[in-house]
Amino acid sequence: MAAYYRWKSFEENEDRPEKPRRYGVTEMRGPHYSVLSQNLLQEIFESMGQFVDGLKFSGGSNSLIPKSFIKQAIEMAHEHGVYVSTGDWAEHMLRSGPSAFKDYVEECKQLGFDTIELNANLLEVPEETLLRYVRLIKNGGLRAKPMFAVKFNKSDIPGRNRAFGSYVVPEPRSSEFVEDIDLLIRKAERCLEAGADTIMIDADDVCKYADSLRADIIAKVIGRLGIEKTMFEASDAKLVEWFIKRYGPNVNLYVDHSQIMDLECLRGRHLGKDHQSVLSSSYFLF
C-alpha cells in the first residue's frame, strides 16, 4: 500500500523550479546496497515523486537484474517524470573494446535509460579517450554524466588519523594536492565542452567531516563548473544537511531513497546557523 504524506507549509524558495529541473536536482540511489522492489519504487514515486528527479542503478546493478524488471522500473520512473541513469558499469564494458562500448550504449537506449555515467577514475584512460566516450554517448542520443572522485595522496594523511578511513587535512597543503584538484576540474571542464550534461563528484573524503575540513575544495569545484552542472554524492544525512546549509536548495545531490523526504524538507526551508534536521517534525504519515 502506498504511503501518503501531508506536508507542513514551508516558506517556498522562489528560485526553486518545478520538474524538469536544471538545478536543485535530487537523484535517488536505486538497487545496490538493498533491493528495491517494484512495489517499493511505486510507493516512492506515488508519495514523493514530485521531489525525485532521477533514479540511478548503482554499481552496475542493472547488469544483474532481469531486463524485464529494468524496463518496467524505467517506464514507471518516466511516468512520474523521473529520468534513469546507469551506475558504474560502462568502464567494465570497455575492457572488451570500443565496439562493446557502442553496443552497451545502444542497449541502454533500448532499455529506456536516459543517462550513462562514466567513472573517470576507474576508466584510467587518456583524457582524449574519455572525451571520445562522452561524444559516443551523446551521439547515441543519451545524456553523459562523467564521475570524478577527489582523492588524496596517502602521504598527505597523518598516520594517527588513518583508522577507519577518516581524513584530517594536513598542514601545510602539498603542491601535489592542489594540482590534483585543478586537474580534476580541468578534465571536468573539457567533458562539459565535449557535451557532457552533468559532472558527478564523489567527494566523501573532503566533506564527510566537513565542519573541520576542506569546504574550500567544494567551493572551488562549484565556482569553476557551476552549480547547475555539478552533482555531489551525499552519503549520509549530515552531509546532505551540510550541502544545503552552505549552497542552498539549488545544489544537485545524489542520495539514498531513505533521504528523499528529509532532503526536500531541507530544500524548502531557510536554514539558520543552529538548524537541525526537520525530518521528525516536517511530515505526518497517515
UniProtKB/Swiss-Prot annotation:
Q: What happens in the null mutant?
A: Normal growth and development under nonstress conditions. Compromised acquired thermotolerance following a long recovery period (> 24 h) after acclimation heat shock (HS) treatment, but normal when challenged within a short recovery period. Reduced expression of several highly heat-inducible genes. Slight increased in sensitivity to HS without acclimation. Faster degradation of HSP101.
What this chain does, per the entry, is described as: Transactivator required, together with HSP101, for long-term acquired thermotolerance (LAT) maintenance, probably by regulating heat-inducible genes expression, thus being a cellular component of thermomemory.
Q: What is this protein called?
A: Protein HEAT-STRESS-ASSOCIATED 32
Asked if the keyword Chaperone belongs to this entry, the reply reads no
Q: Name one Pfam family in it.
A: ComA
Name the domain of life this protein comes from. Answer: Eukaryota
| One GO term of the biological process aspect | heat acclimation
Q: Which UniProt keywords apply?
A: Stress response
What the record says about family reads: Belongs to the phosphosulfolactate synthase family.
**Which Gene3D superfamilies does the entry mention?**
Aldolase class I
User: Its induction, per UniProt?
Assistant: Accumulates after heat shock (HS). Enhanced translation during recovery after heat treatment mediated by CLPB1 in a positive feedback loop.
InterPro entries hit by this protein = Aldolase_TIM, ComA_synth, ComA_synth_sf
